[in-house]
Amino acid sequence: MSKRDNLYLVGLMGAGKTTVGRLLAKHYGCTFYDSDHEIEARTGVKIPVIFEIEGEAGFRRREEAVIAELTTLSGIVLATGGGAVLSPANREHLRTNGLVIYLRGSPEQLCERTRNDRNRPLLQTGNPLAKLRELYQQRDPIYRELADVTVDTARQSVAGMTRVLYGKLDLLKGEATSFDPAG
């Protein structure tokens, strides 16, 4: 399997990984997966329930297993959970088996996008913005180190982000003739 067969989206919650991932999959004729949705489908419960019963560590174990499995596939676009990059094993799977795209948004922007979303256990706190700032400070260096491509989501529409991504991916395609997300 070529490193260029798959596209993996990373970034904090609310960055647009699922939305942009679906568009990339459609554009390139790939199958789309969302690691959080896969976990929910396999367990039959929502992510907050897993956090409540198993804690974050239990959820991360499930996430690691799903990512290990999905990264063996070819011709996919995968939207990962925001904390997936905390696992060295996940980082290795992503780095080795595809192109990693970091959708980078400011904590303030992401807080605005997620303010009414109750399906994000880490933000069910008295100060979600402070939590997002903490997560950004912790994870941004990891995302940047892992990413082959970074797109700033600030003040960009989804259409604008995807246009930027298509351009960047087309440039990579020119540099690496093996790039073919559709397999």
UniProtKB/Swiss-Prot annotation:
Show the PROSITE patterns listed in the entry.
SHIKIMATE_KINASE
Q: Which Gene3D superfamilies match?
A: P-loop containing nucleotide triphosphate hydrolases
Family annotation (InterPro entries): P-loop_NTPase, Shikimate/glucono_kinase, Shikimate_kinase/TSH1, Shikimate_kinase_CS
Q: Needs which cofactor?
A: Mg(2+)
The record's catalysed reaction(s) read: shikimate + ATP = 3-phosphoshikimate + ADP + H(+)
State the family it belongs to.
Belongs to the shikimate kinase family.
This protein is called Shikimate kinase
Q: Which organism is it from?
A: Thiobacillus denitrificans (strain ATCC 25259 / T1)
Highest lineage ranks of the organism?
Bacteria, Pseudomonadati, Pseudomonadota, Betaproteobacteria, Nitrosomonadales
- Give the encoding gene's name: aroK
